[in-house]
């Protein structure tokens, strides 16, 4: 199958904003995709090469890409760099460079999807001395044989800046439409395996029956079950039917642990493989988990010298560190607090009641200095739960989780079986959807960011304010570099940005406002932190903003 067919799909997807049309385009493409390509094409459609949980990365930045294009086309690097400044899109500039290429090689071959994918695998696996040169040559060979439009989308895939507007929901519906299977079965299979390639192949070859038989697999992370918010401990108890398991809500990074004999893999909340960054935790897990095979879930917390938890950003610093890890082990010690188990020695436990899963967890974990069970209180009494809540806050934790004793584990679902209880005017996690260029010495930097809450019903991101304070000069440099590849359009000083990044924002209060489509505006919003552990769809919802507004107004009325 030729790569030009995939490039044409990208072009058509880019031209429409209609989700129904995007779904149809993707479904039609999947129908004609050969079986042997069906496990890789869904990722390429998403603008990726590998699933998020796959450790492999291309490791190619703009500079190396420009060198490869220059080598392939004969267009000087400086000319390509100048073109990028004009177009604002390296993909467009690559297409222009290929158009300028004097002639094709006598041995030129049309690009196929298999060749492109196999080359990407070689690039990802190139390690050690001379690996950058090898990566550049592999890329140059692709660009030598690429047509301008193919080159544009190759470059965007390499840099992860596809801009076609296809996310997981569209791909899920397209798989269902293409192979005439139930969307809910596609969703279920994906939630259990986080692997669209595998799900697409099962859907085509085995249909609804095959999808319904999909099971948890060690080495493929399960989408985490999520919680809704509760206004108070009392409200949580009422919602739970009068009795609940309350657990400390740790201020850390949620992780999923897969153990298979001596092999342990740890995935972050966004399902990225973070195993290499936490070797001391891996060794502690091997000693603590008794079964041969298991999947458990917990919160990884950074511990300060006084034994109190440090902000979760410290854990993210550990995840990002690729070198001098031993130094970081000493600087930022970690502790894993386990709170759930989904799989033990061939048996899936997701249909098992929470109370029984917790009992199983206690049975299979040998606690140690680094591996502990999440502290828990099962009670019917509001006073007991409130005392536990106060204690959690005094210890420096975020609050409490409340869980129904009979709740099954529902991958990817944000329901009321689990509730989180935190102080009323908590910070919000919001998505950057726009920004403005600064003035004077900051004219080359983005300096004010339009942030939005997620509307799960429409899939839209609804703006709730502009955040311009709380950033250091270094933050603005980093944010500009990070966001530039995702600029969709510019109007004067304002740029629209593809929703990719979540930031934590504090504020004085929430106001009703006709200024924004959401109907709300944050008063005096201030940047707190980048939430690299959250995807845009995991940001706070517009319902949560409305809930906080109501709580705030009730609190004012009591004064």
Curated annotation (Swiss-Prot):
Assigned keywords, A-Z: ATP-binding, Cell cycle, Cell division, DNA damage, DNA recombination, DNA repair, DNA replication, Ligase, Magnesium, Metal-binding, NAD, Nucleotide-binding
Catalytic reaction list: ATP + (deoxyribonucleotide)n-3'-hydroxyl + 5'-phospho-(deoxyribonucleotide)m = (deoxyribonucleotide)n+m + AMP + diphosphate; NAD(+) + (deoxyribonucleotide)n-3'-hydroxyl + 5'-phospho-(deoxyribonucleotide)m = (deoxyribonucleotide)n+m + AMP + beta-nicotinamide D-nucleotide
Cofactor(s), by name: Mg(2+)
pH dependence of this protein's activity: Optimum pH is 8.0.
Domain of life of the source: Archaea
Annotated ATP binding sites: 247, 254, 269, 299, 339, 414, 420
UniProt cross-references to Pfam families, sorted A to Z: DNA_ligase_A_C (PF04679), DNA_ligase_A_M (PF01068), DNA_ligase_A_N (PF04675)
InterPro entries registered for this protein in UniProt: ATP-dep_DNA_ligase, DNA_ligae_ATP-dep_bac/arc, DNA_ligase_ATP-dep, DNA_ligase_ATP-dep_C, DNA_ligase_ATP-dep_cent, DNA_ligase_ATP-dep_CS, DNA_ligase_ATP-dep_N, DNA_ligase_N_sf
Active site: 249 (n6-amp-lysine intermediate)
Top-level EC class: ligase
Record EC number: 6.5.1.6
Classification via SUPFAM superfamilies: ATP-dependent DNA ligase DNA-binding domain, DNA ligase/mRNA capping enzyme, catalytic domain, Nucleic acid-binding proteins
Temperature dependence: Still active at 100 degrees Celsius. Thermostable.
Signal peptide: none
A GO biological-process term: DNA biosynthetic process
GO MF, any single term: DNA binding
Subunit structure, as described in the record: Monomer.
Similarity field: Belongs to the ATP-dependent DNA ligase family.
The protein's role, per its UniProt record: DNA ligase that seals nicks in double-stranded DNA during DNA replication, DNA recombination and DNA repair. Can also use NAD, but less efficiently than ATP.
Name of this chain's protein: DNA ligase
Organism: Thermococcus kodakarensis (strain ATCC BAA-918 / JCM 12380 / KOD1)
């Amino acid at each position: 199958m030729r790569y030009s067919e995939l490039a044409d799909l990208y072009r058509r997807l880019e031209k429409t904003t209609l989700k129904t049309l995007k779904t149809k385009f993707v479904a039609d493409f999947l129908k004609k995709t050969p079986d042997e390509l069906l496990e890789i094409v869904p990722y390429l459609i998403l603008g990726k090469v590998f699933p998020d949980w796959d450790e492999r990365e291309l490791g190619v930045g703009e500079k190396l890409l420009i060198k490869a294009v220059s080598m392939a086309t004969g267009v000087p690097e400086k000319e390509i760099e100048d073109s990028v400044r004009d177009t604002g899109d390296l993909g467009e500039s690559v297409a222009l460079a290929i158009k300028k290429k004097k002639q094709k090689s006598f041995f030129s071959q049309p690009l196929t999807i298999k060749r492109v994918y196999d080359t990407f695998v070689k690039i990802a696996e190139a390690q050690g001395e001379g690996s950058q040169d090898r990566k550049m040559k592999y890329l140059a060979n692709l660009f030598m044989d690429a047509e301008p439009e193919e080159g544009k989308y190759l470059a965007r895939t390499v840099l992860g800046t596809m801009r076609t507007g296809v996310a997981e929901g569209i791909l899920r519906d397209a798989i269902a439409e293409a192979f005439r299977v139930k969307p809910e079965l596609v969703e279920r299979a994906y939630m259990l395996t986080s692997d669209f390639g595998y799900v697409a192949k099962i859907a085509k070859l085995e249909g609804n029956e095959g999808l319904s038989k999909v099971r948890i697999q060690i080495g493929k992370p399960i989408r985490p079950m999520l919680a809704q918010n509760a206004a108070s401990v009392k409200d949580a108890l009422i919602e739970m039917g009068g009795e609940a398991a309350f657990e400390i809500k740790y201020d850390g990074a949620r992780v999923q642990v897969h153990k298979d004999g001596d092999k342990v893999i740890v995935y972050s909340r966004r399902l990225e493989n973070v195993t290499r960054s936490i070797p001391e935790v891996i060794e502690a897990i091997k000693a603590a988990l008794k079964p041969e095979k298991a999947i458990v879930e917990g919160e990884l917390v950074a511990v300060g010298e006084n034994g109190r938890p440090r902000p979760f950003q410290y854990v993210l610093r550990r995840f990002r560190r690729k070198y001098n890890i031993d130094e970081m082990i000493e600087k930022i010690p970690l502790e894993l607090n386990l709170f759930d188990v989904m799989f033990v020695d061939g048996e899936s436990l997701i249909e098992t009641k929470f109370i029984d899963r917790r009992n199983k967890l206690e049975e299979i974990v040998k606690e140690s200095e680094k591996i502990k069970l999440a502290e828990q209180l099962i009670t019917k009494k509001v006073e007991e739960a409130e005392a536990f809540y106060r204690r959690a806050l005094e210890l420096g934790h975020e609050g409490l989780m409340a869980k129904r004793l009979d709740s099954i584990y529902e991958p990817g679902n944000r329901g009321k079986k689990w509730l989180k209880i935190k102080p009323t005017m908590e910070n919000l996690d919001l998505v950057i959807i726009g920004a403005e260029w600064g003035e004077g010495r900051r004219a080359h930097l983005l300096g004010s960011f339009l942030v939005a809450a997620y509307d799960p019903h429409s899939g839209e991101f609804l703006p709730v304010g502009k955040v311009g304070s709380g950033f250091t000069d270094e933050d603005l440099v980093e944010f500009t570099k990070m966001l530039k590849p995702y600029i969709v359009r510019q109007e004067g000083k304002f740029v629209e940005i593809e929703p990719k990044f979540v930031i934590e924002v504090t504020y004085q209060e929430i106001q009703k406002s006709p200024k924004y489509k959401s109907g709300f505006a944050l008063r005096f919003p201030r940047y707190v932190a980048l939430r690299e552990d959250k995807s845009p769809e995991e940001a706070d919802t517009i319902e949560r903003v409305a809930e906080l507004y109501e709580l705030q107004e009730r609190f004012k009325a009591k004064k």
